Curated annotation (Swiss-Prot):
Pfam families given in the database record: Tlp (PF19824)
Family of the protein in this entry: Belongs to the Tlp family.
InterPro entries assigned: SASP_thioredoxin-like
Gene name of this polypeptide: tlp
Protein name (record): Protein Tlp homolog
Coiled coil segments of this chain: none
Length: 75
């Protein structure tokens, strides 16, 4: 059985979509934080957004790497 060749042509687009979705989730969660009175819920939501912020940093680093690889022809 042959393995599929590594097709990275759409990686930058997929990562950008993940960035966009994560930013949207952060905004939605911030709205939930503003609209809840329960401190436990607020703390949980804030922690979730902290993890999302960390993921955004990773996505941004990854998208730079992929863009450089794309310029070099993925070699």
């Amino acid at each position: 059985m042959k393995s599929k060749p590594d097709d990275r042509r759409d990686n930058v687009d997929r990562i950008q979509q993940s960035i966009d979705n994560t930013i949207e989730n952060i905004h939605e969660t911030n709205e939930m934080i503003e609209n809840t009175n329960r401190e436990k819920n607020k703390d949980d939501l804030k922690a979730k957004n902290c993890r999302r912020e960390a993921a955004l940093d990773e996505f941004k680093s990854e998208i730079k790497d992929e863009a450089r690889a794309k310029e070099k022809g993925y070699k």
